[in-house]
């Protein structure tokens, strides 16, 4: 539910921005969103003793050289008692920024390390396939195979060695 409301705020916010303001506001939202990782901030935001304007002004004070648009946006969110949506709004804004720039990031996970050349080749092939700039982060874990995830594009490709072994065994048993 929070994501749906966040999308509406982001859509309205984007319509009010020029291309120059877009990146700056994205960074400001990201900075405020990172502050939400602190438990004390949640206490301040949820406190009934602090006025909505004071909450918005406090969040605005966390930013250096912030734009007037972010201040007005924070005041609007505070007035509607939706300051708690800022992390979701930031995430959605980041996604919209990626769509605008045709630049997406994904994860490659598996129990082995890919070489830089292999990673670059995968990035180039996926970039060509989707017509966008794709960057991958390589994560080594216990997954016996390889899994490629592009959440923003809704793509997940996986190859499991265990599954391959099971299917080969099943095929051999059927053949006998």
Swiss-Prot record:
Disulfide bonds: none annotated. HAMAP family: ATP_synth_delta_bact. GO terms for cellular component: plasma membrane; proton-transporting ATP synthase complex. It holds the Pfam family OSCP. SUPFAM superfamilies: N-terminal domain of the delta subunit of the F1F0-ATP synthase. InterPro entries: ATP_synth_OSCP/delta_N_sf, ATPase_OSCP/dsu. It is found in: Cell inner membrane. Transmembrane segments: none annotated. This is ATP synthase subunit delta. The keyword Transport applies. GO terms for molecular function: proton-transporting ATP synthase activity, rotational mechanism. F(1)F(0) ATP synthase produces ATP from ADP in the presence of a proton or sodium gradient. F-type ATPases consist of two structural domains, F(1) containing the extramembraneous catalytic core and F(0) containing the membrane proton channel, linked together by a central stalk and a peripheral stalk. During catalysis, ATP synthesis in the catalytic domain of F(1) is coupled via a rotary mechanism of the central stalk subunits to proton translocation. It comes from the Bacteria. F-type ATPases have 2 components, F(1) - the catalytic core - and F(0) - the membrane proton channel. F(1) has five subunits: alpha(3), beta(3), gamma(1), delta(1), epsilon(1). F(0) has three main subunits: a(1), b(2) and c(10-14). The alpha and beta chains form an alternating ring which encloses part of the gamma chain. F(1) is attached to F(0) by a central stalk formed by the gamma and epsilon chains, while a peripheral stalk is formed by the delta and b chains. It is a peripheral membrane protein. Belongs to the ATPase delta chain family. Keywords: ATP synthesis, Cell inner membrane, Cell membrane, CF(1), Hydrogen ion transport, Ion transport, Membrane, Transport.
